[in-house]
């Protein structure tokens, strides 16, 4: 499909720079097939679900993946900004760096020159390899948990570019950009649909008889990358690591067999569930990378409903929701959201989507 079909105009005033408080007070647009759009709030979620339905959340935790440092060892020391995007082993990360032209294989970057100090000593990284799009492989001077601690001390929260271009990250983002489920470190972007949940909402869902299950997909920086191809068939999707335990898979399969619906909280949860689904719709245990790219025409096997934020024009995530509900339906839903002042992107409002081939 032509990627221009997934484009739309978004006024800058619709882009949220801070979340609402409390989190479950965010607006939520309910999109059902052949039913008028409905404006609700996230706190209404229990009333929109049925006993036996099963929510699936992503429990990944965002690391302090934004590092600032300087190249050392060969004359002038230019400032280097690095965003960690994929862990390769105990000491090596793949990263996006700016300005990439200032680095060559063999160069050493010392991070912490913005005033942050690593108590364990200098956090140095050697450039092992360099790609064509600003990607480098960094071999750090620390390893394993020691490296994790050093990154936490020196790094900053990696806000999405559409927020970071308008304001600098601050202490409030450390809390705001983590979900209440965040427990497994490894993401460089938050699974933002989960940001809407509160302890009170979780209690109300349990009282309604709705189950809640945790899976892990470590969200990569590729989630922010624009689709530059003119046709969806030409786009290469980024890979991310995910896990679904055997116990979770069994519980979801049993609930669905009993008539419960699987409700993915966020596109990351949906992509992982669909990656683990068999042709018969049963979910298998999973521990691997996934680069699944969902566009209109995809046959959903595991997920019946999707709670998700509002996404960028011409993005893989808008393509995904268009596959879930239909392109015309989602273009109309987004036009309504823009016209009525919904807040977009990571800190924005939510939508609750019913799959277009299932009668609500």
From Swiss-Prot:
EC number from the UniProt entry: 2.4.99.17
Segment forming the signal sequence: none
Compartments in which it is found: Cytoplasm
Any Pfam family: Queuosine_synth
Record keywords: Cytoplasm, Queuosine biosynthesis, S-adenosyl-L-methionine, Transferase
Catalytic function, reaction form: 7-aminomethyl-7-carbaguanosine(34) in tRNA + S-adenosyl-L-methionine = epoxyqueuosine(34) in tRNA + adenine + L-methionine + 2 H(+)
Enzyme class, first EC level, given as a word: transferase
MF term (GO), any: S-adenosylmethionine:tRNA ribosyltransferase-isomerase activity
GO cellular component, one term: cytoplasm
Pathway in which the depicted protein is active: tRNA modification; tRNA-queuosine biosynthesis
Disulfide-bonded cysteines: none
GO BP terms: queuosine biosynthetic process; tRNA wobble guanine modification
Similarity comment text for this entry: Belongs to the QueA family.
Quaternary data: Monomer.
Function as written in the Swiss-Prot or TrEMBL entry: Transfers and isomerizes the ribose moiety from AdoMet to the 7-aminomethyl group of 7-deazaguanine (preQ1-tRNA) to give epoxyqueuosine (oQ-tRNA).
Name recorded for this polypeptide: S-adenosylmethionine:tRNA ribosyltransferase-isomerase
Organism, scientific name: Rhodopseudomonas palustris (strain TIE-1)
């Amino acid at each position: 499909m032509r990627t221009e079909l997934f484009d739309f105009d978004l006024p800058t005033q619709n882009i949220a720079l801070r979340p609402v408080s409390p989190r479950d007070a965010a607006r939520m647009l309910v999109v059902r097939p052949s039913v008028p759009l409905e404006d609700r709030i996230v706190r209404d979620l229990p009333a929109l679900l049925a006993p036996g339905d099963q929510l699936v959340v992503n429990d990944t935790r965002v690391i302090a993946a934004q590092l600032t440092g300087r190249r050392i060892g060969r004359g002038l020391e230019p400032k280097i900004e690095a965003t960690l995007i994929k862990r390769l082993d105990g000491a090596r990360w793949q990263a996006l760096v700016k300005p990439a032209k200032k680095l060559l294989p063999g160069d050493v970057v010392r991070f912490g020159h913005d005033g942050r100090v690593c108590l364990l000593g200098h956090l140095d990284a050697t450039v092992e390899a360099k790609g064509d799009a600003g990607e480098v492989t960094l071999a750090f001077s620390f390893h394993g948990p020691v490296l994790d601690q050093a990154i936490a001390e020196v790094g900053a929260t990696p806000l999405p570019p559409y927020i970071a271009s308008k304001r600098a990250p601050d202490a409030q983002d450390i809390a705001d950009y983590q979900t209440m489920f965040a427990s497994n470190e490894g993401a460089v972007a938050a699974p933002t649909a989960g940001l809407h949940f509160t302890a009170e909402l979780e209690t109300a869902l349990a009282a309604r008889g709705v189950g809640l299950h945790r899976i892990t997909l470590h969200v990569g920086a590729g989630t922010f990358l624009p689709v530059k191809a003119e046709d969806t068939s030409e786009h290469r999707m980024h890979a991310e690591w995910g896990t679904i335990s055997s116990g979770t898979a069994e519980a979801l399969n049993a609930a669905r067999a009993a008539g419960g619906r699987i409700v993915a909280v966020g596109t990351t949860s949906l992509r992982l569930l669909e990656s683990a689904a068999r042709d018969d719709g049963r979910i298998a245990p999973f521990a691997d990378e996934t680069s699944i790219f969902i566009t209109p025409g995809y046959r959903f096997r595991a997920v019946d409903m999707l709670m998700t934020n509002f996404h960028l024009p011409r993005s893989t995530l808008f393509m995904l929701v268009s596959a879930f509900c239909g392109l015309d339906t989602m273009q109309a839903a987004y036009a309504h959201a823009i016209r009525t002042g919904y807040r977009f992107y990571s800190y924005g409002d939510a939508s609750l989507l019913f799959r277009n081939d299932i009668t609500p």
